[in-house]
Swiss-Prot record:
SUPFAM superfamilies: RNase A-like. One of its GO terms (cellular component) is lysosome. The gene is RNASE6. InterPro entries: RNaseA, RNaseA-like_dom_sf, RNaseA_AS, RNaseA_domain. Its EC number is 3.1.27.-. It comes from Saimiri sciureus (Common squirrel monkey). This is Ribonuclease K6.
Length: 150
C-alpha cells in the first residue's frame, strides 16, 4: 500500500504534463483562446499562423482551422438556433453562409520547428457558444469551440 502512493503521484504528474495539450492558457478566457486559435481576418501561411498558437501550448497542434472573418461576425452565429454539438451538448450553432477559411495540418517537425500544410477552403462552420466571462466582449453568447466544418 505504501508503494501505491508514490506510483499514483507519478501518474498524476505525468498526466498533468499531457493534459495541458487541450487546456486553455490560464490568463485567457475561453472566448479569447477561441479567437487566438480560429479567427484571422485575412489568409496567412500556416507555418507562421500556427507558431503563435504553438507558443502558448509548447507543442505542435496537429490540426487547426482559421476562419477569415471578424470575431464580431463569428460571435453573431451564436445568436442563431442551437443545435447538438459532437459531444452531445446543445450549445452549438451553424453559420448560415460559408466563409473563407484556412485548414492547417501538421506535416512534420516537433516543437518549436512545426511544419504545416496550408489549404484554403470556403465552407460552413459549427461553433459552441457560452455566456461571456467578465473580460469578454459584451455579447449574449461568445464562441468558445470550433465544433466542425461542413
Amino acid at each position: 500500500m505504501v508503494l501505491c502512493f508514490p506510483l499514483l503521484l507519478l501518474l498524476l504528474v505525468l498526466w498533468g504534463q499531457v493534459c495541458p495539450l487541450h487546456a486553455i492558457p490560464k490568463h485567457l478566457t475561453k472566448a479569447r483562446w477561441f479567437e487566438i486559435q480560429h479567427i484571422r481576418p485575412s489568409p496567412l501561411q500556416c507555418n507562421r499562423a500556427m507558431n503563435g498558437i504553438n507558443n502558448y501550448t509548447q507543442h505542435c497542434k496537429p490540426q487547426n482551422t482559421f476562419l477569415h472573418d471578424s470575431f464580431q461576425n463569428v460571435a453573431a452565429v451564436c445568436d442563431l438556433l442551437s443545435i447538438t454539438c459532437k459531444n452531445g451538448y446543445h450549445n452549438c450553432h451553424q453559420s448560415l453562409k460559408p466563409v473563407n477559411m484556412t485548414d492547417c495540418r501538421l506535416t512534420s517537425g516537433s516543437y518549436p520547428q512545426c511544419r504545416y500544410s496550408t489549404a484554403a477552403q470556403y465552407k460552413l462552420f459549427i461553433i459552441a457558444c457560452e455566456p461571456p466571462q467578465k473580460s469578454d466582449p459584451p455579447y449574449n453568447l461568445v464562441p468558445v469551440h470550433l465544433d466542425s466544418i461542413l
